[in-house]
């Protein structure tokens, strides 16, 4: 699997490499371009994502603690572990960078009693999450912002960010970690869930443009574990307290998404998506699933603390 994936990737990179790099450079995540990059993927419509995601609408890896868990149970196990790593209490004010559709913000407020401020660049997700908190009766405890993470203000007790760092871009990773430090009080904890590239592949990957960056997530970039650790050491006072790898869980999550997408295709097609879109998304699911199975990419939960 890994050898085949590598050949596919090398072939793709050689095809139009200079043009692809130029296009990727123009999509770098400035404040203005970041909003466009997010909209290109996440504003395809909330109804579209509801067809293949779990009941809570989480678009990130689940954590399966046994073979019998379904997708929704795995997603809730993921949220529980993140909140437990942060040791959330009712007195905490939690900052979430990357709202998604509001599942984690709702979960933390409901089950741990904390206040939550969460931010997104997607207008579709902002509208959905705001309405979600109102339906849940949590509008007084959860604030949903339409705001770039670099423009956040204030100080928080805990910080969480789930698979948002991949949308930051390599150039802006130092600013991302500095922002996380600036928004956390001294002694505060941060929990990140991040898709990572193998350390050994990081240098070559950072000089190329892959299928995901070109067609699925414009402006996207996967960090490596070593790169994140070095950036935190160089630019912040964060100390890593826990690192938990769950790569095989992402392969299983993607298999669920692929199956649900295929099963719901007739309904998805009615939303205005064509056969090319169907093939591209099935390739995207399969491409990523193969990467996680081959362990060329993985996903980790990283917990760090300001000292």
Predicted segments with their positions:
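N-terminal auxiliary segments of SAM/dcSAM-dependent transferases
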Residues: 1-51
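Conserved class I S-adenosyl-L-methionine
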Residues: 90-98
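Conserved SAM-binding loop of SAM-dependent methyltransferases across substrates and taxa
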Residues: 101-112
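Conserved SAM-binding loop
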Residues: 129-130
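A short acidic, Gly/Pro-enriched loop at the edge of an enzyme's catalytic core
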Residues: 150-159
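A short glycine-rich, Lys/Arg-flanked "PGG" loop and its adjoining helix->strand segment in the class I
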Residues: 174-186
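Conserved beta-strand signature within the Rossmann-like core of class I S-adenosyl-L-methionine
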Residues: 187-195
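Substrate-binding/catalytic lobe of Class I Rossmann-like enzymes that use SAM or dcSAM, i.e.
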Residues: 196-301, 305-307
């Amino acid at each position: 699997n890994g050898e085949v994936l590598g050949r596919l990737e090398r072939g793709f990179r050689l095809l139009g490499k200079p043009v692809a790099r130029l296009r990727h450079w123009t999509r770098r995540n400035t404040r203005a371009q970041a909003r466009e990059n997010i909209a290109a993927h996440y504003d395809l419509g909330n109804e579209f994502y509801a067809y293949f995601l779990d009941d809570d609408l989480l678009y990130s890896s689940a954590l399966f603690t046994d073979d019998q868990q379904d997708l929704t149970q795995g997603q809730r196990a993921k949220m529980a572990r993140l909140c437990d790593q942060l040791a959330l209490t009712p007195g905490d004010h939690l900052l979430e960078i990357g709202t998604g559709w509001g599942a984690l913000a709702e979960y933390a407020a409901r089950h741990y009693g904390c206040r939550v401020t969460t931010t997104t660049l997607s207008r579709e997700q902002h509208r959905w999450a705001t309405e979600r908190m109102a339906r849940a009766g949590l509008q007084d405890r959860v604030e949903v912002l339409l705001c770039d993470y670099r423009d956040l203000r204030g100080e928080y007790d805990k910080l969480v960010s789930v698979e948002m760092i991949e949308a930051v871009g390599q150039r802006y990773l130092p600013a991302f970690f500095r922002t996380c430090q600036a928004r956390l009080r001294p002694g505060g904890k941060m929990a990140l869930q991040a898709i990572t590239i193998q350390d050994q592949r990081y240098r070559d990957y950072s000089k190329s443009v892959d299928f995901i960056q070109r067609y699925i997530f414009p402006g996207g970039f996967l960090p490596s574990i070593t790169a994140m650790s070095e950036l935190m050491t160089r630019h912040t006072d964060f100390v890593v307290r826990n690192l938990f790898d769950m790569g095989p869980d992402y392969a299983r999550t993607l298999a669920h998404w692929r199956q649900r997408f295929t099963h719901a295709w007739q309904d998805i097609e009615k939303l205005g998506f064509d056969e090319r879109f169907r093939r591209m998304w099935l390739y995207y699911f399969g491409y990523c699933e193969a990467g996680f199975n081959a362990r060329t990419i993985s996903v980790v939960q990283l917990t760090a603390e300001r000292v």
